[in-house]
């Protein structure tokens, strides 16, 4: 999860987030090289005493500055498109969970089970226990099995919301009357925090999301106790 004065991304917990972090580093390297080249050319232009007032055109230079940006854009676009397709691909999910956004809480329904549904509200600051996180804890966590593909169906009952968990590389809009889907896969157990990422009203900041990823046998015990 995030911590104070953090400069980088949160630790990746899912294959998608690992791909996104690699793509971030790949794109940042390209941006750094371009910025260095541009600054170098600007410094040469400001310091050189050579001039070419009689030069009207330069076919070679124009060809280079047309082809080179096209190649750079392709190098950025190809891995980006690959990740987009990976994020939309859902193959044989082990579990389906429907998430509904409300002003200002989330409700969850495990569609593979009968009567396994609940609302998830933020715990007020005055009710927090020692060690719990302000504005991030909820009364009912979303318990999911780790190392299994899980399909999240996301929608809204009222206004636009956005269901986001950064460490899992998830951010899906919750739109009234529309059902969006996303895949959740965690490589390790733990608590993973997120928040509504679409301004949805006065209490937008008080819609946290907490996923509790556990081994499959613990999830089966939890689901049996909830039914």
From Swiss-Prot:
Cu cation A2 binds at residues 196, 198, 200, 204. Residues 1-14, 88-227 are mitochondrial intermembrane. It is a multi-pass membrane protein. Its cofactor is Cu cation. GO terms for biological process: ATP synthesis coupled electron transport. GO terms for cellular component: mitochondrial inner membrane; respiratory chain complex IV. It comes from the Eukaryota. SUPFAM superfamilies: Cupredoxins, Cytochrome c oxidase subunit II-like, transmembrane region. GO terms for molecular function: copper ion binding; cytochrome-c oxidase activity. Disulfide bonds: none annotated. Cu cation A1 binds at residues 161, 196, 200, 207. It catalyses: 4 Fe(II)-[cytochrome c] + O2 + 8 H(+)(in) = 4 Fe(III)-[cytochrome c] + 2 H2O + 4 H(+)(out). Its main location: mitochondrion. The modification Phosphotyrosine is found at residue 218. Its EC number is 7.1.1.9. Pfam families: COX2, COX2_TM. The keyword Lyase does not apply. The chain crosses the membrane at residues 15-45, 60-87. Residues 46-59 are mitochondrial matrix. Mg(2+) binds at residue 198. Binds a dinuclear copper A center per subunit. It is found in: Mitochondrion inner membrane. Keywords: Copper, Electron transport, Magnesium, Membrane, Metal-binding, Mitochondrion, Mitochondrion inner membrane, Phosphoprotein, Respiratory chain, Translocase, Transmembrane, Transmembrane helix, Transport. Component of the cytochrome c oxidase, the last enzyme in the mitochondrial electron transport chain which drives oxidative phosphorylation. The respiratory chain contains 3 multisubunit complexes succinate dehydrogenase (complex II, CII), ubiquinol-cytochrome c oxidoreductase (cytochrome b-c1 complex, complex III, CIII) and cytochrome c oxidase (complex IV, CIV), that cooperate to transfer electrons derived from NADH and succinate to molecular oxygen, creating an electrochemical gradient over the inner membrane that drives transmembrane transport and the ATP synthase. Component of the cytochrome c oxidase (complex IV, CIV), a multisubunit enzyme composed of 14 subunits. The complex is composed of a catalytic core of 3 subunits MT-CO1, MT-CO2 and MT-CO3, encoded in the mitochondrial DNA, and 11 supernumerary subunits COX4I, COX5A, COX5B, COX6A, COX6B, COX6C, COX7A, COX7B, COX7C, COX8 and NDUFA4, which are encoded in the nuclear genome. This is Cytochrome c oxidase subunit 2. It comes from Maxomys surifer (Indomalayan maxomys). The lineage of its organism: Eukaryota, Metazoa, Chordata, Craniata, Vertebrata. The gene is MT-CO2.
